[in-house]
A protein has these predicted regions:
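Sec-dependent N-terminal signal peptides of Gram-positive bacterial secreted proteins and lipoproteins
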Residues: 5-26
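Beta-propeller-forming repeat regions
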Residues: 22-235
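N-terminal hydrophobic targeting signals that begin at the initiator methionine
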Residues: 1-2
Length: 235
């Protein structure tokens, strides 16, 4: 089997996973009630220390934003993001002055206390899901965040934290995404699925270089009238 056909078969299998995945989203009123309940309590341990450090840096109490689905359901992501061997922290939050979700990056100082290094504004007011990925051929780890806007539009952002700076290396509208090693390299790839205006389904396979620039490895488009399942992708 040649490389092109193998790649198309892999994309076919991934499309089946994406299309058949079941998502459970809380109604807006229930989600608001949950977040309001989670706003007030003081947390303990590292989470409490992170919350205090963020509030001190902001000069007000942040409202923590919980992803509504996925494997990572906490507003706190503890991970060595820049590959320096030290644990970093990303915190999802909003304030009275911000419409969209913000992401704060914190690191420990020499005394072991958490300190905010940077904060960036996200793409929408709701965090749909969060995942960690190794999309670059480095020791660093990227933060992949899916957002949902009020109009139910979905936006994906990939963040890279290097040399003390959090950079957005990808922003794109999407419906489903998957992180997987498809090309067989030393890093993972990003698969995006979206529906076009004419109803056709587009699948994009992207891979990143060491500098964080993404390039398209493959793009498959399936017309609405011809799409009949995975066989139409592999044909």
């Amino acid at each position: 089997m040649n490389r092109t056909r193998r790649l198309r078969l892999v994309l076919c299998a991934l499309l089946c996973v994406l299309l058949c995945s079941c998502q459970t989203v809380l109604p807006a009123n229930e989600k608001a009630q949950v977040e309001e309940l989670l706003r007030a309590p003081k947390l303990s341990g590292d989470y409490g220390a992170l919350q205090t450090a963020l509030n001190d840096w902001l000069g007000e109490s942040a409202q923590l934003k919980y992803p509504i689905q996925g494997e990572l359901l906490s507003p706190f992501v503890l991970q060595d993001l820049d590959g320096d061997g030290q644990q970093d922290a990303a915190v999802l939050y909003t304030t009275a002055q911000t419409a969209n979700v913000c992401i704060a990056i914190l690191q420990r100082d020499d005394a072991g206390s958490w300190q905010v290094r940077q904060s960036v504004e996200g793409l929408a007011e709701t965090v749909e899901n969060v995942s960690l990925a190794q999309l670059q051929d480095t020791d660093s780890c990227q933060l992949v965040v899916g957002y949902t806007a009020a109009q139910n539009d979905h936006y994906l952002a990939v963040y890279s934290y290097q040399d003390g700076t959090l950079s957005t290396i990808l922003e794109q509208q999407y419906e489903q995404y998957l992180v997987e090693n498809i090309t067989g390299g030393s890093s993972q790839d990003l698969i995006l699925m979206s529906t076009q205006e004419d109803g056709s389904v587009q699948i994009e396979l992207l891979t990143a270089d060491r500098e964080g620039s993404f390039r398209h490895v493959a793009v498959n488009g399936l017309s609405a009238d011809k799409f009949s399942g995975c066989a139409s992708v592999a044909a």
